[in-house]
Curated annotation (Swiss-Prot):
Pfam families: LOB. PROSITE patterns: LOB. Residues 4-105 form the LOB domain. Belongs to the LOB domain-containing protein family. It comes from Arabidopsis thaliana. It comes from the Eukaryota. This is LOB domain-containing protein 10. InterPro entries: LOB, LOBD. Residues 264-277 have a biased composition (Low complexity). Residues 297-311 have a biased composition (Basic and acidic residues). The gene is LBD10.
Length: 311
């Protein structure tokens, strides 16, 4: 038998034995606990409940009985149900207040404050593969901040493959130009063809920026005038820039243009309206002297005829 009886045995005024069911759960230091349980459920009912349960669940059962008995004593009508309902209503009120506070906070800070910050790739020697794939789509000359600069040696094979498509493109342009020239010649639109391909009506070719004079314009002495520099159109200058850039001139295209030159008429002027030619000094005087020499024989012959008629 224990030296000090438990709270249940002391309240019931009986001896507390070693087999007492209440001794482990109702210590003598807290007699109010057994008073509430005994007042609501009764000692005999509590004994039956504890005997039907395993030892590891008895302590939790005693605590539940105590809480329920205390609530029933404080509120005889609702008991623990009223306390549970009060706690549920209080929880709903707290949730509503929290939602209202969040809405006010969004109104003060703005919608941008709620958006999470963008993902920044880690800076290191080996960036992730997704970041490297995104760098491949960037234009040349753009270096992302925080990334090391990688210098690679030029690949000669890539340069060779890059040059081949350019040559093929030039050949295609030349063949297309020849085909267009033949079509425009058949249509009879020579003036539009001459203006489009850099061929003047006086027989000069301005594809390379120089004019070539016809043989008919040479003097009687057989002296050839030097090539004269002409100011071509914008298309001619662009074509000349492409030819000089690649280091060679498309001779087939020039030959085709020379074949399409119309014959010069007598007395046709070398320069047209809107085209400026820069000839070397002394060429104009040379042509004037040659024309005077050609005109002298007919004049002398006419003078001799007049003298014979007078006699």
């Amino acid at each position: 038998m224990a030296s000090t009886p438990c709270a249940a045995c002391k309240l019931l005024r009986r001896k507390c034995t070693q087999e007492c069911v209440f001794a482990p759960y109702f210590p003598p230091t807290n007699p109010q606990k057994f008073i509430f349980v005994h007042r609501v459920f009764g000692a005999s009912n509590v004994t039956k409940i504890l005997n039907d349960l395993p030892p590891d669940q008895r302590e939790d059962t005693v605590n539940s009985l105590f809480y329920e008995a205390e609530a029933r004593i404080r509120d005889p009508i609702y008991g623990c149900v009223g306390l549970i309902s009060f706690l549920q209503q209080y929880l709903k009120k707290i949730q509503q207040d929290l939602l209202t506070a969040k809405e006010e906070l969004v109104g003060y800070l703005g919608p941008d404050a709620v958006i999470p910050p963008p993902y920044l790739p880690p800076i290191g020697n080996n960036p992730p593969p997704n970041f490297m794939m995104s760098m491949e789509g960037m234009p040349p000359g753009v270096i992302p901040q925080g990334e090391p600069l990688m210098i690679r040696e030029p690949n000669m094979s890539q340069q060779h493959h890059h040059q081949q498509p350019q040559d093929e493109q030039l050949q295609f342009i030349a063949s297309d130009a020849q085909r267009m020239a033949a079509m425009m010649l058949e249509r009879g639109d020579q003036q539009g063809m001459f203006n489009g391909y850099g061929i003047d009506n006086n027989g000069s070719v301005t594809a390379t920026g120089f004019n070539q004079m016809d043989v008919n314009d040479q003097g009687a002495g057989g002296s050839l005038s030097g090539p004269s520099l002409a100011l071509g159109s914008f298309g001619d200058a662009y074509q000349m820039g492409q030819e000089t850039e690649h280091g060679h001139i498309n001779h087939d295209q020039l030959q085709t243009q020379l074949m399409l030159q119309p014959p010069l008429q007598e007395g046709q002027e070398q320069t047209e309206e809107g085209q400026f030619l820069m000839q070397p000094m002394g060429q104009e005087n040379l042509h004037d002297e040659e024309e005077e020499e050609e005109l002298e024989p007919p004049v002398k012959w006419r003078m001799s005829e007049n003298k014979e008629a007078s006699f």
